[in-house]
């Protein structure tokens, strides 16, 4: 049914909360803002980082760029490794690859960072292509990321594709492009968020995700 499966990265393949939140706190400290608690800052996980600083703190463009620079200063060297792969993801990817599925990554994270994470957890070999943002922030919206992944792999039959993610941006991006989606509840988005965004399927954990994907 679905021969091409697109995975979000943060909150779907790996739990990157610690590294992202600590790096956001580092950036906010530099700007002179006392960061909120971890639950507040978890909203930074998933959306493009520039968009988050602007939306949550109403920074002007110059301050956004300073915040992004400081975020990356810490995240590139330390934060990217403050990360854990969700239990069972590697087994799932192996089974899907064994069934001949084409696996793609569609993330708002810059491609070099995404590749670092995938290589760190030794799951990079399962993916045919990694689509993500450019370092300057271009192509960071999830719709653009998904479109780019499909274009670069010459995928025309949208009915053969499904997107998996934990936030509304993943689901909305999939709908905008015209493909089905699965929302996962083990990441950073809740049932209401994923349901209201229009997820075609919602699963609680990696086991449920595996059962669903292997049933297609």
Task: Please report, for each region that a protein language model flagged, where it lies by residue.
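Active-site neighborhood of HAD-like aspartate-dependent phosphohydrolases
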Residues: 1-43, 57
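Helix-loop "lid/cap" segments that line or gate small-molecule binding pockets
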Residues: 27-28, 48-61, 117-120, 149-152
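Metal-dependent phosphoesterase signature
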Residues: 54-91, 99
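A short, structured active-site edge motif that brings together acidic residues
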Residues: 124-139
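Conserved Lys-Pro-Asp/Glu-containing loop-to-beta segment of HAD-superfamily phosphomonoesterases
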Residues: 142-171
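Acidic, Mg2+-coordinating phosphoryl-transfer loop and its flanking beta/alpha structural elements
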Residues: 163-203
């Amino acid at each position: 049914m679905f021969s091409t499966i697109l995975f979000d990265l943060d909150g779907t393949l790996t739990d990157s909360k610690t590294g992202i939140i600590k790096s956001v706190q580092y950036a906010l400290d530099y700007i002179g803002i006392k960061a909120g608690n971890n639950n507040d800052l978890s909203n930074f996980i998933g959306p493009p980082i520039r968009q988050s600083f602007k939306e949550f703190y109403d920074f002007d463009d110059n301050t956004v760029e300073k915040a992004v620079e400081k975020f990356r200063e810490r995240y590139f060297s330390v934060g990217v490794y403050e990360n854990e792969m969700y239990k069972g993801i590697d087994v799932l990817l192996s089974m899907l690859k064994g069934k001949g599925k084409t696996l793609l990554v569609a993330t708002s994270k810059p491609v070099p960072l995404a590749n670092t994470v995938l290589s760190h957890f030794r799951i990079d070999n399962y993916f045919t292509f990694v689509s993500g943002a450019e370092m300057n922030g271009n192509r960071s919206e999830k719709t653009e990321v998904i479109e780019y992944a499909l274009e670069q792999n010459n995928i025309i039959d949208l009915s053969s594709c499904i997107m998996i993610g934990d936030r509304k941006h993943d689901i909305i991006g999939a709908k905008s492009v015209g493909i089905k989606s699965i929302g996962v509840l083990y990441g950073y988005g809740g049932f209401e968020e994923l349901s209201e965004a229009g997820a075609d399927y919602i699963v609680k954990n990696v086991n449920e995700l595996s059962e669903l994907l292997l049933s297609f």
